[in-house]
Amino acid sequence: MSPTMFTIISILLSLICLVVGYFVRKTIAEAKISGARNMAEQIVEDAKRDAEALKKEALLEAKDEIHSFRVEAEQEVRERRNELQRQENRLLQKEENLDRKDESLDKRESLLEKRDHSLNERQQHIEEMESKVDDMIRLQKAELERISSLTRDEAKQIILDQVENELSHDIAVMTKESENRAKEEADKKAKNILSLALQRCAADHVAETTVSVVNLPNDEMKGRIIGREGRNIRTLETLTGIDLIIDDTPEAVILSGFDPIRRETARIALDKLVQDGRIHPARIEEMVEKSRREVDDYIREMGEQTTFEVGVHGLHPDLIKILGRLKFRTSYGQNVLKHSIEVAHLAGLMASELGEDAKLAKRAGLLHDIGKAIDHEVEGSHVEIGVELATKYKEHPVVINSIASHHGDQEPTSIIAVLVAAADALSAARPGARSETLENYIRRLEKLEDISESYEGVEKSFAIQAGREVRIMVKPDSINDLEAHRLARDIRKRIEDELDYPGHIKVTVIRETRAVEYAK
């Protein structure tokens, strides 16, 4: 290639490069200008948004300040209003105090006037009495002049007779008032002692029944208990003296008998036989004998546990065992051992309040029904049997007298005997302590109402509170107030003579007179 051509080509390439560079530079410049323009617009937009945000923030701050100012203003107004209300209340209070003081001054002035009037009347009365005394002195002088011819002893006797006649009525009135005050104080103190004792003593009672239930693993066991031709059940009934009732009750056998110790022996023996699975006459005899020993041990443990619980020590071992037998005795559904424990606690608490020997009172209370443990085995009442047992085991004379007198068979010779009788009545008569059969209960209620309605003038009677109170409505035109009291006493006496009941029965006679008119 010639140099000239090379030069031309170089020039052309340079020109092309210049043109291309120009256009490239122009394009870059335009792009930068466009980017700068966009950036400027973005900055403007951002500035506008920031300005708008600042504006809103300023408005919110202004609103918050306005709200805060308003709240503070309302609070201040409220406080001022409350302060004004308090000032008004204080003024009203002062005004009321002034009114009360004014009223008090008026009352005081009225009282002073009454006292002045009373003093004037008293002064007048004193003057009248002085006049009467002067008259009496003159009369006495005249009487002395009349009897001056008598001896000294005769004159003294005449004066004493006159004084006795004048003061006999006053002495009788004062004696009656003193007796009433003494009775009121004694009643108040007795109620206080009883309430304190009852509050500090709490005992639970379990109502016993005449049946026990033995659960079986399955009904097939019933056939094994009966045995071939009934020999097993006959053996068990013969050895324990308890009837076995096998009926449709699922998986259960009922033991029926009135001797709780025998029934418990049969229950334990039957439980052992069911668990062992071997049921035949020889095994039954073995289990019954073992159950008797267990029941005897349990009775002894119950006696020892009871003496420990009550805090009575030094009892004869045989007496402790007899005491444990009370666990299986009931009276009107009340467990006798629980009843004896409650009586012991009540008697001890009341003895402490009266300053008597609390331990001796507990001992007497615990043993007061000891005769019930064997009264079905020995002839005589439980009181007589209890006295014999206490005497046999050399108990304290106070304990023996407490047993003998707690039902009124003998006179109590000590305060402790009286406390035991009171504790026995409290434990037996409190609501829920004793129960009776439904038939006897209904019969007793009907008898109460029949006795009450048998008197002339009785309109209707109601036995309420489970038979512990009877209310008698009488005709007011047939019976007056005095006759109502006499009627209550007569009904009370008939109830005591004709009915047997635990605790006491309150007799209330209600006489009501109504006068009705209609305004038209």
Swiss-Prot record:
InterPro entries: HD/PDEase_dom (IPR003607), HD_domain (IPR006674), HDIG_dom (IPR006675), KH_dom (IPR004087), KH_dom_type_1 (IPR004088), KH_dom_type_1_sf (IPR036612), Ribonuclease_Y (IPR017705), RNase_Y_N (IPR022711). Pfam families: HD (PF01966), KH_1 (PF00013), RNase_Y_N (PF12072). It is found in: Cell membrane. Its main location: membrane. One of its GO terms (molecular function) is RNA binding. One of its GO terms (cellular component) is plasma membrane. It comes from Bacillus pumilus (strain SAFR-032). Coiled coil: none annotated. This is Ribonuclease Y. Keywords: Cell membrane, Endonuclease, Hydrolase, Membrane, Nuclease, RNA-binding, Transmembrane, Transmembrane helix. SMART domains: HDc, KH. One of its GO terms (biological process) is mRNA catabolic process. Residues 336-429 form the HD domain. Belongs to the RNase Y family. It comes from the Bacteria. CDD domains: HDc (cd00077), KH-I_RNaseY (cd22431). The gene is rny. It is a single-pass membrane protein.
